[in-house]
């Protein structure tokens, strides 16, 4: 429990320190995420992983990019 507390405190300091130097919150948060990670890449990776778990070969499949025009099936 103490470890979780200190991790939370350190995360707050990590975000708050640049803010005290005049940074904007949005810029600070964007700085925590690598530039090459996009929502499309994450979705494609998750869909690709799901397909490979269902028995398909991941080496031959390209990640599927979800577009705004695609319909998302609602779960039960």
Swiss-Prot record:
Residues 1-22 form the signal peptide. Glycans are attached at residue 60. Belongs to the conotoxin C superfamily. GO terms for molecular function: toxin activity. The keyword Zinc-finger does not apply. Expressed by the venom duct. This is Contulakin-G. It comes from Conus geographus (Geography cone). It is found in: Secreted. The mature peptide does not contain cysteine residue.
């Amino acid at each position: 429990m103490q470890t979780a507390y200190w991790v939370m405190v350190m995360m707050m300091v990590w975000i708050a320190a640049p803010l005290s130097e005049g940074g904007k919150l949005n810029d600070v948060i964007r700085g925590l995420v690598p530039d090459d990670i996009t929502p499309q890449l994450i979705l494609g990776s998750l869909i690709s992983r799901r397909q490979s778990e269902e028995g398909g070969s991941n080496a031959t499949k390209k990640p599927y990019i979800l577009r705004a025009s695609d319909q998302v099936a609602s779960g039960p």
